[in-house]
Amino acid sequence: MQPMYPMHAAPPFQAPPFGQRPNASGHPVGAVFLGFFASVIVSLLYSGLILATYKDQSITTANTLYLGHALLNGAIVGWLIGLVGHRNTAAHVWGAVIAALGALFGYTNAIVLVLAESRGGGAVWDLVRYEPFWPAKAWWTDNSGEVDWFSPLGLVLAAAAAWGIAHLIGNRRRQP
């Protein structure tokens, strides 16, 4: 017969707590929706600014306004997502996607508004029927038909600003 070994008084691991666990901090879905609505508003304001000033703009001014719009869109979206979504990485990533799309659609909507103002509603209807992706093609290329590298740079700036600011603000907040 083997000798008996003494029993341990407690298990070697801590037992899980009883009761409900506290909810995770932040509201990632609400943060994404709030960022989306803010991005739509910033993009509409940018489109209105371009519509009001397109006759007096040089290429340098247009590119500067586009990059400024992308940074502003990313900063506002990132700030809101960081405040509401806290440390949720998925909310930060979706904020970057939303900010980049806001920069793209702000530019393409401005092109359509300028076309409607300068040539009338019939031109927009023809555009929709025969060349629906023309605003995106105009966003991607410059006047000579070459790739306009300010366009993807604006997307990168918007996404980086949104993710970076959301990450900084979200990680600064304390978890309960």
Predicted regions located by residue number:
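Intrinsically disordered, low-complexity Pro/Gly-rich regions
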Residues: 1-21
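Transmembrane alpha-helix entry/boundary detector in multi-pass membrane proteins
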Residues: 29, 33, 50-73, 92
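C-terminal binding/interaction regions
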Residues: 108-176
